[in-house]
Amino acid sequence: MLFRIPTLFTLFLACFSLVSGVFGYSPMFGSNTIELNSKNFRKFVKAKGPSLVVFYAPWCGYCKKLVPTYQKLASNLHSLLPVTAVDCDADQNRAVCSQYQVQGFPTIKLVYPSSKGSSLSSTDYNGDRSYKSLQKFVSDSIPSKVKILTSEAKTQKFIQDAQNSSKVILISQKMKPTLLYKSLSNEFSSLPFSFMPAKANVNDLFNISAYVDTSDLPILFIKHPNNGTSFFSNSLNRDSIVEFLQSSIKDNNFSEYLATFCSKKSCIITIQDKDSDSGIDESIRKKYPKLHFVRLGRNTTVAERLEDTLDLGYSDTFLLSLKKSHYNAKPYGKPLRRWLEDIQVQQAGPSVSLPNDLLSKIK
């Protein structure tokens, strides 16, 4: 049952309204739910991908009843996709609530970038408001880039397509990919992801039977452009899989690594002696979650190519932004924390344009 929207919105403005472009937590649904508004809604979904959205009003009784379930959903799913909320009682949000034809509270939708053009698409949720039903809706409805390999022809096509890219393959006793696997394919969209039900019986096309027991499922592995294969040997959770993707691709093709992990986030790349034990302070990583930190061994081929291609001087650390096509080298001897603070307030000096052929030079 929906609480019907009054003809006129109340004049009371939510005291936790967000500044356009700044994403904060929801005052109603808690710290794992992101509060959006008319100004930043489209930009957020275009940048972050498929997002669960609840359109609500603070005074709505049914919305209040939804809070514990939605908080649990956000707690369990926020690492897989954004869980968000829009306060339709705020005047500033009339446009987005009208655009998505919100006629009652709470209205729940999965919103995602359209495959055609720059618009957004959405799928309505019409089930009960139990955790199990909502979780199933997200898992079933989320679009993904996973190719389902159920025949020899589909598998051969997947192998032949994008021959210069590392390919991620999961062979499973299940018949369809999990929400975790789908979300990873969206997050790392430059990598081809595939899913093979064991019943399809076409895994021999990847020539892996000499390396693993193909009856011991699930099997997650990466086929690299150089015909090398990396096998995953941990539990199938997000952090372990991401670490596997990063380390495997970094070791095989650093330019592909940058294109995959430094295209959406800026990267902080540090070049150190191989036996150095001075890593990145964990508190710095937590303070700058939008940065991706990379460590390279000094005198390695990749490090030497980067030093030859970029004008780093005596610097051993630099910020690389493929999206903006520039880099900024940390002054020699300056503490990393202070340098990052300088960047944050635009006091780190001018950035330098990246060479157009950077990725081809550091393969």
Curated annotation (Swiss-Prot):
Transit peptide, UniProt annotation: 1-24
Keyword Cell division listed: no
Subcellular location: Mitochondrion
Keywords assigned: Mitochondrion, Transit peptide
A biological process from GO: protein folding in endoplasmic reticulum
Domain Thioredoxin: 32-141
Family matches, as Pfam families: Thioredoxin (PF00085)
Matches recorded under InterPro entries: Thioredoxin-like_sf, Thioredoxin_CS, Thioredoxin_domain
GO molecular function, one term: protein disulfide isomerase activity
Lineage: superkingdom: Eukaryota
Keyword Transferase: no
GO CC terms: endoplasmic reticulum lumen; mitochondrion
Major localisation: mitochondrion
UniProt name for this protein: Thioredoxin domain-containing protein C13F5.05, mitochondrial
Upper taxonomic lineage: Eukaryota, Fungi, Dikarya, Ascomycota, Taphrinomycotina
